[in-house]
Each structure stands twice: as structure tokens, then as C-alpha cells.
Amino acid sequence: MPDEIIRRKRRLSSFQIIILGFAGVILLGALLLMLPISTTAGGVTPFNETLFTATSAVCVTGLVVQDTGSYWSAFGQAVILTLIQIGGLGVVTVAASLALLSGRKISLMQRSTMQDAISAPQVGGIVRLTRFILRGTFLIELLGALAMLPVFCRDYGWRGIWMALFHSISAFCNAGFDILGIEDNLYPSLTGYAGSPVINITIMLLIRDWRHWISDVE
């Protein structure tokens, strides 16, 4: 009996699990961004800068202290994009999807945490809803990338594939990150494509779909 009481006291609430999950992902992302392989210059980025960048990516705020396109290498950009995707989907949703892929069963407590994480109305059907969110998210992001692919490949060659994928995920997760680099000491972002109907319409639809996705889940 005393052991059961101790275990109950030590059990984390859904809110605590979500907070610790986000904090853990942010810290891991910050440490990965500190690696020399994460920058184009091959140097070590100060922890305060990588922590800020990782937090911004996971919390999808779009604030940066270094230009994402020119400062970070392909590896660093991949880390940032992964953090954006995790932040957009939610740490608990990503963890649950990995558990499902590995064939593990989701416990009732885990289902309750998933319910709180995505603001689902009930625990029943939460696993099915999570699968639906994952499939829908990846499908929409893929379609967005395919729509922008011809434009970016025309301007950047094979690198356009990565450009299309990055901006599709960033837009759908409403993250505000871009990898278009610096021109004349300015950060043009997507202003260079102000006259491109394909890029403009695709980005707008991706952002709009994200907002509708959130409202439908809630």
C-alpha cells in the first residue's frame, strides 16, 4: 500500500508530461545545433543562440538570431525543420506515432495525455484521430511541396526539392521560417516571389489549412 501511494505521488500529470516533452525536445535541438556540422562555417554556435532558435522552431514563432538559409548547413536546417514539425504536430502526438509504428500499445494514461495535447473532446477514438492527423498533415505538406517544386527547381536546381519541402512544412505549421538567404544585407524571405501565383497561393492555402486543421481538432 505505501508503495502504491509513492508511485501515485510520483506520477506526472498530462500537463507536466507535455511541458517536459517540449522542454526536452528544445534542449536536444539546441545541443544538435551547437555541433559544428550544423553551420556552414563549421563553427560552434553559442548555446544561448541555439536555445533561442530551437525554442522558436518548436514553438513556431519564426524568430531567429541567425539567418536560417545562409548560417545553418543542410544538417542544421534539417534539425530546425524537424523541430518545426514536432512543434506543429505536438510532442505527444509525435511520441504516440512512434509508439504506434513500433507496434506498442497505447495505455489509458497515454491516451489521456494525447487527449489533452490535441484538445480532443474525448479519450475514445484518440488513437484513430492521431493517425488521421498524421496522415492528413503529411499529405497536405507533400502536396504543398509538389506544387512549389517546379518554381524552386527552376531557380535553385536540385536544391529546389529541399526548398519546396522546407517551406511547405514551415508554412503548414505556421512557423515563419525560410531558407532563402540574404541579399544586399537584407532578409527578403518570400518577397522575391511576390509575383509568383504558384508560391503565393500555395503558401496561403497551407497556412489556411493549418488554421482550419487546428479548429477542427478543437
For the regions a language model picked out, list residue spans one by one.
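Membrane-proximal intracellular helices of multi-pass ion channels
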Residues: 1-218
